[in-house]
Amino acid sequence: SSARLEATVFSYDGKDFTRTKTTVLTAEGKSAVGTKLDPAAPAYKALAGGHSFTGEVTAFGKKYDGSYAPLTGADGKVTGALFVGVAK
């Protein structure tokens, strides 16, 4: 079987990265839209600082090899992020 590619678009309000569009499912098998990126996640600090993050991440009990990239406005402030990953 081929690996499933997952993708997420996050909005950022200065405190939370919230999943606004995603193919990622929760542990219960429901869409993860509306859930937040864990502030303890390694990607959170990088994204909040305007930096990308690539590595192994865990979401809803599943491990992924993935990359996150910040989205910024014209003023350079972080407004969101993108995630693309493959479940391990």
Task: Label each region the model flagged.
Residues K63:
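Beta-strand residues that line the small-molecule/cofactor-binding core
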Residues T8-G14:
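Short hydrophobic alpha-helical segments used for membrane anchoring or interfacial signaling
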Residues T58, G66-G76, A87:
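A short, hydrophobic, proline-anchored segment that marks a local hinge/packing element in signaling
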Residues G80-V84:
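Sensory beta-strand/linker motifs that couple input domains to effectors
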